[in-house]
């Protein structure tokens, strides 16, 4: 129904769902209500809703549709389905497609191994497995694998390699595997070792930490300082990932603690995972434009998040009371979790910690206030430039030339959408920019920007305009920004902008909000370009020195550990053995290469 024709008298007082749409019919927001008439009155009546983000939503809303249901449970389920279907901008919509880092022990093999996996849920074909986690990062996951390899000598090879091996591998020589593949240990001995490793993963880390501390002390006494430092880093990671913190009062429970930070329309949700008494870490979900009440936000978030999570805890702590008592029973689990707002001191401490973590995630965005209105008027845009792309390139004397594109969308940098380009054309910066822009806009697999910003002057502006015209792309505003040579005032840089309105360029005052915003974008693009260049340059360095029989992966591992070829060649045999994948034959090759005259 058109909003100007909308009458609250015609709205049912039953439970239901409402859809707010713009003039194009796009669904902006989906909400549920116990009483549709009362809920919609809070939007339509003056001073009915005090939330700052609501006027912004209502400015864009031209139509409201309602769907009446029998009860609140139906309303929750319908709301969730409609959010998934329409993906409205102002709702909680989980776009974080990352899976979870876990450690898996497959029980289908007579000699189980522990491996790192990324999963959304238990695979149907692999029900006979134990899962440990999820862990907050890959680093934490692989650090635990490294500890297990050091202290619990279980096999790490694939099932195929296990079945075909004829003799023990180098890990057996290093006492990091019992070599069950060739029958050098009994089933009982192997199972006892596996049980100890599983006990460690369940939280019994005291003996392992004690052994690591002794190993660090021994390495220091023997002046093997690099080895001691590596062990210390491992110990630190174990303590961060496994050690019990101030949540010991809850060690009998698995708890997720949800926190929320808001600023304007920005909402950030944090999820602290407390697993068997251990605070593992947090995951964060950022919603740039959210118009839901806190209670509705958490209800919607819980329904979506735990539909994808391989583990549903026994309890979920939230900072506000939810008005959906049936919510736990809508989750796909045999044992519905308790969802509550804790009243105990420790529960409040955890909620405060979750809020603090969410607020920390907002810090990079707090200083960014895009001057959308000024941009729209200055460049005569038909709408706010919600998606902006900024381009830069980097090289050193023409070598390892790289280009990058960074994305600023809905008021936030979007690193997931950043792109890098290895430039193949040989020439000046103009040729490099032309290649990058052509490759970006020839492939229309991603959303087009409203505005593109380029680090450059008049020539870059003309080239960019020509490329967009050749590709028949309209509605994209091009701006280039360049330092004005010889025009500085007390460390405030004078910058000149080139655009369609000012093709000859215009100088903006250093305090201009538009100029400062563009400088922020350019600095981020430059940072990302330098980062990508260094990675490419480092990869090229790996190929400058080659040892016959030592591949790129092993070369990288050697240089990561020893930092230079000189230190690789003077390393002892025992030190070289600590590098993953290095065999006795490899050590012989390294020593032979190091013995050659320079």
Swiss-Prot record:
Interacts with UvrB in an incision complex. One of its GO terms (biological process) is DNA damage response. It is found in: Cytoplasm. It comes from the Bacteria. HAMAP family: UvrC. Residues 13-92 form the GIY-YIG domain. Belongs to the UvrC family. It comes from Chlamydia trachomatis serovar D (strain ATCC VR-885 / DSM 19411 / UW-3/Cx). The UvrABC repair system catalyzes the recognition and processing of DNA lesions. UvrC both incises the 5' and 3' sides of the lesion. The N-terminal half is responsible for the 3' incision and the C-terminal half is responsible for the 5' incision. Pfam families: GIY-YIG, HHH_5, UvrC_RNaseH, UvrC_RNaseH_dom. InterPro entries: GIY-YIG_endonuc, GIY-YIG_endonuc_sf, GIY-YIG_UvrC_Cho, RuvA_2-like, UVR_dom, UVR_dom_sf, UvrABC_protein_C, UvrC. PANTHER family: UVRABC SYSTEM PROTEIN C, UVRC/OXIDOREDUCTASE. One of its GO terms (cellular component) is cytoplasm. Gene3D superfamilies: 5' to 3' exonuclease, C-terminal subdomain, GIY-YIG endonuclease, UvrC, RNAse H endonuclease domain. GO terms for molecular function: DNA binding; excinuclease ABC activity. Coiled coil: none annotated. This is UvrABC system protein C. CDD domains: GIY-YIG_UvrC_Cho (cd10434).
């Amino acid at each position: 129904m058109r909003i100007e024709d909308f009458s609250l008298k015609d709205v049912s007082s039953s439970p239901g769902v409402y859809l707010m749409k713009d003039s194009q019919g796009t669904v902006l927001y989906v909400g549920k209500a116990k009483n549709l008439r009362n809920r919609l009155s809070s939007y339509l009546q003056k001073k009915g809703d005090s939330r700052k983000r609501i006027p912004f939503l209502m400015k864009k809303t031209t139509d409201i549709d309602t769907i009446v249901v029998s009860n609140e449970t139906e309303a929750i389920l319908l709301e969730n389905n409609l959010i998934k279907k329409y993906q409205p901008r102002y709702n909680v919509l989980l776009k974080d497609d990352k899976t979870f880092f876990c450690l898996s022990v497959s029980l289908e093999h007579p000699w189980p191994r522990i491996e790192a996996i990324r999963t959304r849920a238990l695979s149907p074909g692999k029900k006979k497995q134990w899962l440990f986690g999820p862990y907050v990062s890959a680093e934490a996951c692989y650090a635990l694998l490294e500890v297990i390899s050091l202290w619990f000598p279980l096999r790490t090879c694939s099932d195929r390699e296990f079945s075909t091996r004829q003799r023990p591998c180098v890990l057996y020589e290093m006492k990091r595997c019992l070599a069950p593949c060739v029958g050098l240990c009994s089933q009982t001995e192997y199972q006892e070792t596996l049980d100890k490793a599983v006990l460690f993963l369940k939280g019994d880390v005291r003996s392992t930490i004690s052994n690591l501390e002794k190993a660090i002390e021994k390495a220091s006494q023997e002046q093997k300082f690099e080895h001691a430092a590596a062990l210390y880093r491992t110990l630190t990671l174990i303590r961060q990932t496994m050690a019990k913190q101030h949540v010991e009062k809850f060690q009998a429970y698995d708890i997720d603690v949800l926190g929320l930070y808001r600023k304007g329309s920005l909402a950030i949700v944090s999820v602290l995972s407390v697993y068997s008494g251990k605070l593992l870490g947090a995951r964060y979900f950022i919603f740039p434009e959210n118009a839901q009440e806190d209670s509705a936000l958490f209800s919607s978030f819980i329904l979506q998040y735990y539909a994808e999570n391989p583990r549903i805890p026994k309890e979920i702590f939230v900072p506000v009371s939810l008005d959906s008592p049936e919510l736990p029973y809508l989750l796909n689990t045999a044992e519905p979790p308790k969802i509550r707002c804790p009243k105990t001191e420790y529960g409040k401490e955890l909620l405060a910690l979750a809020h603090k973590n969410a607020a920390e995630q907002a810090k990079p965005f707090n200083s960014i206030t895009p001057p959308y209105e000024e941009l729209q008027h200055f460049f005569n845009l038909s709408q706010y430039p919600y998606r902006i792309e900024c381009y830069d390139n980097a090289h050193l004397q023409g070598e390892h030339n790289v280009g990058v594109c960074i994305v600023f969308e809905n008021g936030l940098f979007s690193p997931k959408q950043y792109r890098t380009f290895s430039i193949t054309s040989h020439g000046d910066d103009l040729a490099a920019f032309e290649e990058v822009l052509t490759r970006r806009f020839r492939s229309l697999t991603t959303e087009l920007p409203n505005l593109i910003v380029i680090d450059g002057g008049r020539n870059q502006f003309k080239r960019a305009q020509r490329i967009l015209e050749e590709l028949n792309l309209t509605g994209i505003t091009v701006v280039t920004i360049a330092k004005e040579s010889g025009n500085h005032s007390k460390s405030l840089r004078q910058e000149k902008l080139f655009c369609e309105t000012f093709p000859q360029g215009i100088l903006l005052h250093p305090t201009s909000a538009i100029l400062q915003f563009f400088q922020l974008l350019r600095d981020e693009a430059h940072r990302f370009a330098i980062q990508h260049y260094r990675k490419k340059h480092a990869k090229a360095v790996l190929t400058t020195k080659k040892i016959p029989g030592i591949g790129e992966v092993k070369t990288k591992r050697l240089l990561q550990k020893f930092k230079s070829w000189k230190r690789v060649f003077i390393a002892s045999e025992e030190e070289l053995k600590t590098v993953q994948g290095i065999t006795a034959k490899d050590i012989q090759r390294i020593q032979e290469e190091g013995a050659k005259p320079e």
